[in-house]
């Protein structure tokens, strides 16, 4: 039954379920058999209130989904059905917390130039980082699509590897093909091919990858490897970004997902049609609009246009 969940979802649920069990144990909400299931609506309300001190309402819903999954695994009925009191508690938490929105900032073309100037591309690790950064930016990649937490966590049928890269010409390349075998919105691993053309130097993913691939070699494993042989992880990527922008005097929350947000933002600013932005980011709905960040300057200019 565990195969019905993506591996990342399974890990998230497992952590949430452990927290639920610990809460029930400490709050005296366990059944005589020692199990928290089946959970009553009142138990779920107490758990939700407990979580609200450290989690936002959207994260709390993920924890409740994990509790539902626990019940399903045990062959029990869905504990969230017809829970009117629980729904009111959730609405109250959302109203109290307010709408904070995403704090993650976009990495735009301006930020990409800052990253480039901070690196020494004759260094293996720096070149690898630049190749990964440009690929993530120009192809709107999610961090899970190009990073791996460790060598032992690498799954050939899921993660990006050297065999997933192909160029149209080794003499004068003009296009690179990237095979994404699995992603957040592709749970059945149908896969998709992404294409990358030449950019304007130094912001060119094709050029960066062409430089990196000879250093990477043809050995099996993750596409992006440090000189030590360890893979580029999301944690390492985020730490490098934080250090680079801190050294440049730029404050804010930049993460591995900032490449995707920045790509959508710059694409919209550059006048790329909505349907192309949606296709480039592989969004199945209008959710891509949530990724576009509009600066205060642009909004101010827009109001002035109303008087023309």
Question: What is each PLM-predicted segment?
Answer:
Residues 1-308:
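Extended, non-catalytic subsegments within catalytic or DNA/protein-binding/adaptor domains
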